[in-house]
């Protein structure tokens, strides 16, 4: 988990050194199109407000990453929707769902192509505290069951209990008008 001050909107982590692990030497020489393809295959995203396409059913939204990567669809949408408690919503458009149901559909979409990493940006910001707790616990449980590295950026300190490891941004500097750069942070493993 990345815990950021409440005054910070977007921010950027800039590498200070080292090399990424397990991505191969070609990664360092990749152009932006190759990097985009790599991200599409290896990273699932959960956006703050879900980011579902409003003209696609929940089923089609969940299947979208698999369709784009030309992976077989199978029963992935049904399985993930069932695990997230939204199976009855599969044939509805996002506008017909509650905020919490839309966020669970977004989580299913992020997991649908079985990426090794899922990045969730404020996944519970628009949800009431009770449902935020449920969704966070569910996301953490699914990430553990599916062996996915889950990175959550949030202002919500109460979500830290679900994290195995937390980066706490103490000092944030403006890099430009639209983003922030973390200049100092501490890494804290969570107590068992």
Locations of regions flagged by a protein language model:
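ABC ATPase NBD coupling module
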Residues: 18-44
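Conserved ABC ATPase "signature" region
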Residues: 74-89
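Conserved ABC ATPase signature
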Residues: 93-97, 101-103
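Hydrophobic anchor residue at the start of the ABC signature
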Residues: 107
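A short, proline-enriched helix->beta-strand linker immediately N-terminal to the Walker B motif
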Residues: 112-116
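Catalytic Walker B motif of ABC-type/P-loop ATPase nucleotide-binding domains
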Residues: 118-121
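Helix N-cap at the start of a conserved alpha-helix in ABC-type nucleotide-binding domains
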Residues: 129-131
């Amino acid at each position: 988990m990345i815990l950021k001050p409440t005054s910070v909107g977007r921010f950027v982590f800039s590498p200070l050194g080292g090399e990424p692990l397990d991505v191969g030497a070609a990664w360092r020489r990749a152009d932006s199109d190759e990097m985009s393809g790599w991200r599409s295959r290896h990273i699932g995203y959960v956006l703050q407000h879900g980011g579902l396409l409003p003209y696609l059913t929940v089923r089609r939204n969940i299947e979208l990453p698999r369709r784009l990567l030309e992976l077989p669809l199978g029963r992935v949408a049904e399985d993930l929707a069932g695990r997230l408690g939204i199976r009855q919503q599969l044939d509805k458009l996002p506008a017909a769902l509650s905020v919490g149901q839309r966020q669970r559909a977004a989580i299913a979409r992020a997991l649908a192509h079985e990426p090794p990493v899922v990045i969730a940006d404020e996944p519970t910001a628009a949800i009431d505290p009770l449902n935020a707790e449920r969704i966070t616990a569910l996301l953490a449980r699914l990430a553990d069951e599916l062996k996915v590295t889950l990175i959550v950026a949030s202002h919500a300190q109460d979500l830290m209990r679900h994290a195995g490891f937390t980066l706490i941004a103490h000092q944030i500097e403006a890099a430009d008008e639209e983003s922030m750069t973390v200049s100092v942070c501490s890494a804290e493993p969570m107590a068992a």
